[in-house]
Amino acid sequence: MKIKNIDSIEVLDSRGRPTLCTTVVLDDGCKGTAFVPSGASTGSLEAHELRDNEERYGGLGVQNASENAKKLLEDLDNKRADDQASIDKLLIEIDGTSNKSKIGANAILSVSIACTRAAANSLNLNLYEYLNILYKKQSNLHTEMSMPRPMLNIFNGGSHS
């Protein structure tokens, strides 16, 4: 289950803002795809979302982040997609900044999530089952999965609506 290809394109999110769609392909043909739309507001300590700052889309384009995501194949080629901790550590090391501003948090996150989904598909597992396996491995807890409890907002407003 080794990484063989990474493709990333600019797409529009539900608010018409550019975001990344990244697909990771494994040597067994399995794929994982991730979209990483940004929030309506950002905090001062959040990871840096790389934007093009050009005329297109009022400076919000993500073509540079898309290219950065594709270039990550140079470092991730033939890496095991099911070693999520190593992949994430390597992505952070490659960026080398505290706020992920060199490659862009959007590029890093899209590749990370796409790898996770590709690994789950390769193991013929639902994503939630695969994430549970990763959680148990990381935490050394061996609790049984249970039905999730919904968490939702009753009232919304402001920049998040």
Language-model-derived ranges and their functions:
Residues A40-L125, E129:
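Metal- or metallocofactor-binding catalytic centers and their adjacent structured scaffolds
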Residues P18, N106, S159-H160:
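Gly/Ser/Thr-rich beta-alpha loop segments that engage phosphate groups in nucleotides
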Residues M1-T19:
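Short, Gly/Pro- and small/polar-rich lid/capping loops
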Residues F35-H48, L125-S161:
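Flexible glycine-/small-residue-enriched beta->alpha junction loops
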Residues M1, I9, K100-K102, A120, ...:
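Residue-level signal for helical boundary/lining positions with a hydrophobic bias
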Residues L20-V24:
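Short beta-strand scaffold segments in enzyme catalytic cores
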Residues D27-G29:
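Glycine-centered tight beta-turn/hairpin loop motif at sheet-sheet or coil-to-beta transitions
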Residues S8-V11, K100, I108, E144:
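Short glycine-aspartate micro-motif
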